[in-house]
Swiss-Prot record:
InterPro entries: PRC_barrel-like_sf, PRC_RimM, RimM, RimM_N, RimM_N_sf, Transl_B-barrel_sf
All copies of domain PRC barrel, residue ranges: 92-166
Single biological process term from Gene Ontology: rRNA processing
Location of the protein in the cell: Cytoplasm
Domain of life: Bacteria
Quaternary structure and partners: Binds ribosomal protein uS19.
Species for this entry: Buchnera aphidicola subsp. Cinara cedri (strain Cc)
Protein name: Ribosome maturation factor RimM
Pfam families: PRC_RimM (PF24986), RimM (PF01782)
Alphabetical keyword list: Chaperone, Cytoplasm, Ribosome biogenesis, rRNA processing
Domain comment (free text): The PRC barrel domain binds ribosomal protein uS19.
GO cellular component, one term: ribosome
Family label: Belongs to the RimM family.
Main location: cytoplasm
Amino acid sequence: MITIGKIGKPYGILGWFHMFSYTEKKNNIFNYFPWKLEKSNILLYKNNIIHYKTHTDHFLIKIKDINNRTQTLNFIKQNILIKNFQLPKLKNKEYYWNDIFSCYIFDLKKKKIGSIKNIIDNKFYCTLEILYKKKKIYIPFIQPNFIKKIDIKKKIIVIDLTNLNNQLI
């Protein structure tokens, strides 16, 4: 299962929710039904979402038969999951972000640096948050400057540390 978004807190008193999309184009989340809500195992189909609208950097959604704030409690604060096969097949050397979470980071000398804990999108480029010796380091996801090689099958990402101002010391 892949996390493609999150249902947040209730919005107002009429059964609306905040919903955050993690897809590259925010609206694409509505192309991948059914959704499974992680904690409650509730399945939501396209016809369950009776209305949605953009609200700042996320969406407000209205789910069928949820008409007040109390009824929202079974839905809130849950990741939205889909099955891997629901995503389009990719070409060679393409990958989804969730594919790199299982990769280990190595430097150019083949020394293991750590594993990816998060991907941060700062609007200009993404940054990998890596756990290294119980501390977090941040690597810009810029190819080929910092990211030299990605091998999803071997679960390896090779990075160049020479431009990172010794943040590993």
